[in-house]
Amino acid sequence: MSNYETSQTSDLKELINKLRDTQTLSKNEWIRLIDGRTPELADYLFENAREVQITHYGHDVYVRGLIEFTNYCRNDCYYCGIRKSNLNAHRYRLTKEEILNCCKTGYELGFRTFVLQGGEDGWFTVPRLADIVSDIHKNWPDCAITLSVGEMEHDAYQTLFDAGADRYLLRHETYNDAHYRKLHPVSLSARHRQNCLWDLKSIGYQIGTGFMVGAPFQTTENLTDDMLFLKELNPHMVGIGPFIPHHDTQFASEPAGTLELTLYLLGLILSLIHI
């Protein structure tokens, strides 16, 4: 390794230390840390992230009961296999009784968090969803209820919260508006999705967000914007994952996101946000 490379690695390690200690980096520092990653730097990051994880979260693993209750969706996101224009998707939706039976089985198995996740299915109106949430809350009051059902207006989120929902998962996908428009139809906007997250947080939900890694057209600057948004929002949960091309979308031939970059970003996020 040359003296220049040694110096650069040392500088980037100092940025990792700064992130760990202050949870703050400038945009330029984020870009340097992402673009300058090496196996050696990743090992140093993971060592630091592991210390943060043990200090703040210990070694506990929490198991969630995920109920995928519908794959109908009104949206047409270009990367998604359940987009409304995919006529090859086998559609289904669970009944209220089937959802409650899933909760009953899960409770008997020891689950104490239920996650209701689905596409933005117009059949499940806010009153219908609120009725289901209310029954889950009444039958299993010691369980947390998490929703992941997409974008709504403030009043709808409030109704579901009042019915007993505790948490809400809504990945922002990408913060940058221009990048967002390349992945979604004009009926959807990055700003509206971000506003949904602010609404959810103001109501009192524990919120989770996140983004795709290696999505088509994604740049380091886009990832940096995502990191700065996470810092500003300070969510309770963050979930990221590599972009996986779906065969029934226009991105079918695009390369998948990498595990290497996903794990590296997870290490950075763990150092950035620890509740």
Protein language model features and the residues they cover:
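Flexible, acidic/Gly-rich N-terminal and inter-domain linker regions that tether
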Residues: 1-75
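Conserved, mostly hydrophobic/aromatic
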Residues: 22, 49, 77, 116, ...
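N-terminal pre-triad scaffold of radical SAM enzymes
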Residues: 44-86, 91-115, 166
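Glycine-rich, proline-tolerant flexible connector loops at the mouths of alpha/beta enzymes
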Residues: 64-67, 115-126, 178, 244-253
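Core AdoMet radical
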Residues: 84-99, 106-127, 132-197, 206-213, ...
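Catalytic cores of alpha/beta
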Residues: 154-160, 216-230
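A beta-strand-loop signature enriched in Asp, Gly, Thr, and Trp
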Residues: 226-269
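Conserved small/polar residues in nucleotide/adenosyl-binding loops
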Residues: 273-275
